[in-house]
Amino acid sequence: DGHMSMLLAAAQIIKEQQLVKRGKLKTLFQPAEELGSGATSMIRGGAIDDVEYIFGAHVRPFEEAENGQASPAIHYASSCRMVIAFHGKPAHGARPHLGINALDAAVQAVNAVNAIHLKPTDNYSVKATRFLCDSGVTNAIPAEAVVTWDLRAQYNKTMDELCAKFLPAIEGAAASIGATVEIRDSFRIPAAELHDEATALLAESISAVLGESNCVEPIYTPGGEDFFFYTIEKPSLKAGFFGLGCNLRPGLHHPDMSFD
């Protein structure tokens, strides 16, 4: 609601003061950012077909930018959700040798993924965030387990490398005890690809409006943002993304979040 209100108010001021002297300005009220599907729906609707520059904004917690400050660039990371089902073979708990324990396969896979290492200078993480396994009773070998992983990487190339190691790790771990794997869900959001010219324009604008001292350093965050599907779909776009300080406390997505 805050972001929509900001853009609506800015659009009203731009129109009333007739600030657009040449060209055309579009204001994109994009839905479903948190689901990761909003930008792609706008693309399918033709919203960026005739666009050369595209700018996004996101409010920032007070630790990153105080009220009245803004950053000309937010370097969002790539994020990926992987939901993997492990299939074994059911058996009675008294006869485990007749079954294949899907829970064991999933545990092996979690440990295998935790052993993935990329270059220490790369900013990345991969961790299991959900583990579901229930045969319905406590004296049976479970035939299925489902694990969800959250993958993060600051750059798209790093995410490519992480994904390339992830799947062989889980497949090998499961195969080591005779289990198989099934990808139930996979969804990836690209990392930021910001254009130098667009970022420079934002820095110039922030300095002009808020003062040069209130134009803070670029922000690097492990969070994801589906805005960057725009540049994936249309590489010629000059994209910029700025962060706005607004006394946001105690933090983004907190149930008690407030901002000015």
Task: Cite the ranges covered by each PLM segment.
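Metal-dependent amide/peptide-bond hydrolase catalytic core
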Residues: L103-D260
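Active-site cofactor/substrate anionic-group-binding motifs, chiefly glycine-
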Residues: D1
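Histidine/acidic-residue-rich, glycine-tolerant segments that coordinate divalent metal ions
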Residues: M4-L8, I14-K15, L19-P142, G224
